[in-house]
């Protein structure tokens, strides 16, 4: 008997939406990354993108535990000498709350071209309005 190998044409991707209201950031991002990778499916294949599309609503209402709301710092580098920049969790939540969830989920996905294609299936919105109604997403309780 031959081993089953999934083909790109056989992959079925569904659309789901989740509500981030009063969810803990790390646990929430972990559950989303599993869905984006497709590890919840029987036909999961490590070298293929078998995951679903995820729409995250109410990103502005996400929670963090402890003192992370004040103390957590996000770093990035501009590429120039002395170009390290830092922003606190509170500052990012005021500017763009969706960015916090995107950073957390992106760190939990594989690095490389496969991870980038998985990350493109994540759509994050800071409120309840989204522009993917035509895809008829189903509610997913995380």
From Swiss-Prot:
Name of one Pfam family that matches: Ribosomal_L13
GO biological process, one term: translation
Presence of keyword Acyltransferase: no
Top-level taxon of origin: Bacteria
PROSITE patterns, sorted: RIBOSOMAL_L13
GO molecular function: mRNA binding; structural constituent of ribosome
InterPro entries assigned to the protein according to its UniProt record, in alphabetical order: Ribosomal_uL13, Ribosomal_uL13_bac-type, Ribosomal_uL13_CS, Ribosomal_uL13_sf
Keywords from the named record: Ribonucleoprotein, Ribosomal protein
Similarity comment: family membership: Belongs to the universal ribosomal protein uL13 family.
Protein's recorded name: Large ribosomal subunit protein uL13
Chain's gene name: rplM
